[in-house]
Amino acid sequence: MRTNCWWRLSGYVMRHRRDLLLGFGAALAGTVIAVLVPLVTKRVIDDAIAADHRPLAPWAVVLVAAAGATYLLTYVRRYYGGRIAHLVQHDLRMDAFQALLRWDGRQQDRWSSGQLIVRTTNDLQLVQALLFDVPNVLRHVLTLLLGVAVMTWLSVPLALLAVLLVPVIGLIAHRSRRLLAAATHCAQEHKAAVTGVVDAAVCGIRVVKAFGQEERETVKLVMASRALYAAQLRVARLNAHFGPLLQTLPALGQMAVFALGGWMAAQGSITVGTFVAFWACLTLLARPACDLAGMLTIAQQARAGAVRVLELIDSRPTLVDGTKPLSLEARLSLEFQRVSFGYVADRPVLREISLSVRAGETLAVVGAPGSGKSTLASLATRCYDVTQGAVRIGGQDVRELTLDSLRSAIGLVPEDAVLFSGTIGANIAYGRPDATPEQIATAARAAHIEEFVNTLPDGYQTAVGARGLTLSGGQRQRIALARALLHQPRLLIMDDPTSAVDAVIECGIQEVLREAIADRTAVIFTRRRSMLTLADRVAVLDSGRLLDVGTPDEVWERCPRYRELLSPAPDLADDLVVAERSPVCRPVAGLGTKAAQHTNVHNPGPHDHPPGPDPLRRLLREFRGPLALSLLLVAVQTCAGLLPPLLIRHGIDVGIRRHVLSALWWAALAGTATVVIRWVVQWGSAMVAGYTGEQVLFRLRSVVFAHAQRLGLDAFEDDGDAQIVTAVTADVEAIVAFLRTGLVVAVISVVTLVGILVALLAIRARLVLLIFTTMPVLALATWQFRRASNWTYRRARHRLGTVTATLREYAAGLRIAQAFRAEYRGLQSYFAHSDDYRRLGVRGQRLLALYYPFVALLCSLATTLVLLDGAREVRAGVISVGALVTYLLYIELLYTPIGELAQMFDDYQRAAVAAGRIRSLLSTRTPSSPAARPVGTLRGEVVFDAVHYSYRTREVPALAGINLRIPAGQTVVFVGSTGSGKSTLIKLVARFYDPTHGTVRVDGCDLREFDVDGYRNRLGIVTQEQYVFAGTVRDAIAYGRPDATDAQVERAAREVGAHPMITALDNGYLHQVTAGGRNLSAGQLQLLALARARLVDPDILLLDEATVALDPATEAVVQRATLTLAARRTTLIVAHGLAIAEHADRIVVLEHGTVVEDGAHTELLAAGGHYSRLWAAHTRLCSPEITQLQCIDA
């Protein structure tokens, strides 16, 4: 890979031959003109000034014409060179995204989101930085070749001396290439690890906040950042070692040429004009030589980035697309023939499964969490290929079928209802983008989502936000069901399609499903007894093995495991009584229950960043000392660089014109000493800048991440999560890059400008006025450039965040995109965002290409003016030839820093936009404050006082005037239709959000007065969105209490019924879990979440649909454990299944954000209202007479 990455990149560049030819052609023509200009200068000095026998006007016209041509050619070179860089970056990004869309299940399990983000952002930026200079490479090489040819024509001895250092420079460059490539690759790997930590913390932010683990996640980031810090310091040291050395060697060659050329001019071997022309050529070549040396460093970093990007592009699915189309039969059969499968070799998840579903038949597959149901569904849709055996659809092996024809026949309702950014209508029509509004409404009506949609101001055009998390779990699930029904599949695969809806809605959905599956084959993977009414036959899975298949009655009679799964488990009651007497978390003197209370490591806390109106500026003030030292060294380095022109003037006027060779030798020796001193100072400056930059980056990233962790959940809605990831990664790096390089360039440029102006005034003040005539034009051009580019950079930065958000979204929802054959539409969406970012980049490049060459044009015009007037003064004896030559050299140096300042403005704009975003983030108010009340043990009284709440993305309020008082120790179950506000109440108690109006009080205190971390340390929460962080199963359970012993972890798992599932996993409690739990089923994740909440022994327990993914037997165990826990603490439960409501102290019924009923179970049944209807539906759905279940007319 590494040997051919340059060839691969050149292939991408060659896709844009027109731009390449224009850029190279302009570079070639511009180089020829630049190399010939010193010859014009030689003629002017020898013939028009020194000899005084030729007019200056014709030469001035030639110089002005050359300046105009150079401006146009430089514009073309810069514009098309930058355009190539943006086009190739876009092509690489699109190819990487296309590779992502092709991934099968194994590739999706292999790649982390952190790797994806870094390789498509940071690594691509490294490649783009090199591609910007593609035309410059040719220009520099041509400049060197033509320059050497011109110098050889001027003087062979001097030319030989000038090229003596080329082999030395080549050897040093070769060594730097080898070391920098390895160091940069290592640093990029660590950067991917940091991004992975950030992305995981943002994706799992609800879990982080639920258990008050913000500091723990910050510790993770700090540890990953420390490893990155060490790797980046190695890169900085190598850059400091090789960069100044490669730039110093050409300068030493200049001093050697100065000494030899001056001696030859003094001896009459060459003319003063030839000497000045040779020096001008050498000066012209010094810049390309230094640039090429610097580009070697950039090239090694770009190579490391290119290798990583190309690895992503080259990733291929492990399964091979078939060649045969699926048969066009109206009904399809599904058959598993002795199927075995394992995610890891030699660790089977399914063992010898033989199961057939006849065409037109509905089969229900039941089993406990981790039994293999979801894996079976993945094999049917061919996310994976079987290890042994075969899966056949319509009698054809799925491995022989084209994926397009296979997936076009299948409709999938997954256990996790993944939605995409866009509107409700677009998500329903995800599998049929050509669907009419009437067809979308019909599917929504079938999924019982239409009533909710009609209450929204924008109806089906309402945006759902990233991953649809602004909707309730039931609403997302019904949209996913409508999406599958609109697809009109011949084979319908549903994985618990009604687990998050209430009983009344489930009855209606079942009636519709009964009609929908009447003329098609269907497989229902379910844990709910009510769904079995739709099935013709039932299959029972247990630990990856098929136990029984038959009609529901037959299996009920002969399969004990089936009866156990669908019935409560009374034999566990005694264990629960023991558990009640032996709590998992025994109080220990001086020991808290959260990780934050046990760590001795100081990390950035909620108030570590300095307060005030501009926290970013205050934070950067911590590094004033190192930054000042770095800038002081830069100033010394710059001053040393201003001495050579003065030494050259002395050497010409005294050493050459007056034949005082000792003056020439002293000038050359002083120049050499100056170059060496400059090299040492430059090395020190690079070391200090490198160390300081990495320290600032480490500190800034940690503080921004710690602050982001403490923001309210509303900051993570819409695309806020992607913007936060961008802020912690790309934005902090943009700021530090400017501090490390841009600020250095600014200091160099300012010091150079001041020093040159002083020198020019000292040589001849009158000529300075000629230079100042160009300044008003330059100031006007700079103002216009800044005004136009500022808007472009801001838009481009925001668009980059959108590109990253789209990548994260499709990486998370790839299986749904593939199941509904939406890869091409995903590619179109990503292309639109990426192309918009590219066009903004090209627009910015056009502005740069117009502005920077204009500065050089003004420099050339000023040089011509000074040359004309200076020649007249030389003839008049006012100034010497040496003084005029020095003046011309200084003019070249004068406009160089002006151009670099203008170029630095590009980095400044990027940093300014990034700083604005980070400043805005750091200024966002967090729920906690330094004056917050500390929280000890809570009694648990909860009061809602006239509480209203509205989500930012919705006009309809989620809660409207809630007044409730929940005494300490009471168990309250909230019921109602999906979207009625139940989960929002739980989130307000957890203080994920603050009420829009009204107050939530606990133990008589407004939650806004509590220390938010201390308060959440007293809670145990199970949210709808299950998330676990990468690590072992044991780590996942102990997330809220990392100090728990293995025995305590196991006891918590036993009490919620998770222990059998865990021991069935490979390595049991040490089983490795991927970020987000992608290698676990929804039921397994829910059991881990319950054990996690149980372990912390909370004062207030909050359960939001905590058992929707569990089978009845496991659910019964969990409910008994919940009631045992609830006996000692306040417990608030959101439930669609009403089994636990019967045993609760109190039931609160919500509809449309208001309380419509409140009372005990028997009271509400007697009232005959909302709860009575819900209970009647629930009773019918959960009747033990499974074969005779009937849904009531809701």
Curated annotation (Swiss-Prot):
Keyword match Cell membrane: yes
Subcellular location(s) of the protein: Cell inner membrane
UniProt keyword annotations, A-Z: Antibiotic resistance, ATP-binding, Cell inner membrane, Cell membrane, Membrane, Nucleotide-binding, Repeat, Translocase, Transmembrane, Transmembrane helix, Transport
EC number per UniProt: 7.6.2.-
SMART domains for the chain: AAA
Stretches assigned to the ABC transmembrane type-1 domain: 21-301, 628-910
Annotated ABC transporter domain residues: 334-568, 942-1177
InterPro entries in the cross-refs: AAA+_ATPase, ABC1_TM_dom, ABC1_TM_sf, ABC_transporter-like_ATP-bd, ABC_transporter-like_CS, P-loop_NTPase, Type_1_exporter
GO cellular component entries: plasma membrane
Main location: membrane
Gene Ontology biological-process annotations: response to antibiotic
Topology versus the membrane: Multi-pass membrane protein
Biological role: Overexpression increases resistance to chloramphenicol, ampicillin, streptomycin, tetracyclin and vancomycin.
Domain comment as written in the entry: The ATP-binding domains (NBD) and the transmembrane domains (TMD) are fused.
This protein's name: Multidrug efflux ATP-binding/permease protein BCG_0231
